[in-house]
C-alpha cells in the first residue's frame, strides 16, 4: 500500500537518525490474546504467494504486516497505534471514513487503499507507513518527532479493508522490507526465527503455522460473524433455549479439519461439529456446536468445549474453554 506516497500536498521532511531501526510492537495490544497477525509480506515476485517462512500467510502483492483486532467491538472501544521506532512524521492522511470495503457505501479506493495513514521517517532511508487508521484519531502532525511506542492514532476501518487491523509497511528507499526477514529478494526459510527488525518485546508476534483462535465462547443459539464482530453473544444462563459453543479461527489451510465438541457436567458429549476437510485455505473460519435445552433447563455444573484443528492426522491448533451454569 503506497497511496500516501503520491499525495502532492504533503510536506516531505527527513529524520536525522541513521542506521537500521529496531521495531517495537506497533499496537497497544497483547499478541495472541487481543491481536493477531493474519498476513505477512508477500515475498513471491510473480504469481503465487510466499511468506518469510515459505508458507502462504499472505496474499498476492501484499506489501506489509497486518495485525488485526479480535472484532469490531474492540475497534470501537479504541486501540492505539504506536510508532514502531523513533523518527519524524513526514506524511499523513485523515478524513477517510471507517467503513468496510464490502459495504455498498464504501468510497472509491483507487489511490487511497491505505485509508487514513501516517508515514514516519526513521533516518537512513528507512520509513514505516501505518494504514487503516480511525478517522479523526491521528494525534501527530507533519514534522513532529515521535518516540518508539508513542501513540499516533487508533485502529480503524478506513481504506481497502473489511476487518479492523493495522497494516504496517516498512521501506528502505523504494524497497519494501519484510520486517521478519529483512534480507531482500524472494528468499524464504522454514527455519527463520522471525526476529528480523523486531525488538525482543515485539517477538511475541510469533509465526503460527497452525493458525490461531481469534474468538471463542458460548451462546444461546446459532452464531454468525456479525454477532462475533459485535463482541460476541451474551453469556447464556440455565434457562437459555439452547447452549452453543463457537470458535472463529484464522489462517487455516486447505485439508484442515476443525472439530468442536461440547460436553456437559456429567461428561456426556452434548454436541459435536466435525465437517469435511476444508476445500481451500481460509483467512477465517467459524464453527459452532450446540444443543437445545432439555425440559426444565440446563443442569447446574461445568460445561466444556474442546476445539482442535487436525492437519494430516495431527493436532496443529487447540483450545479448551468452559462455562459454569
Predicted regions and their residues:
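Zn2+-dependent peptidoglycan hydrolase active-site motif and core
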Residues: 76-78, 84-135, 170, 258
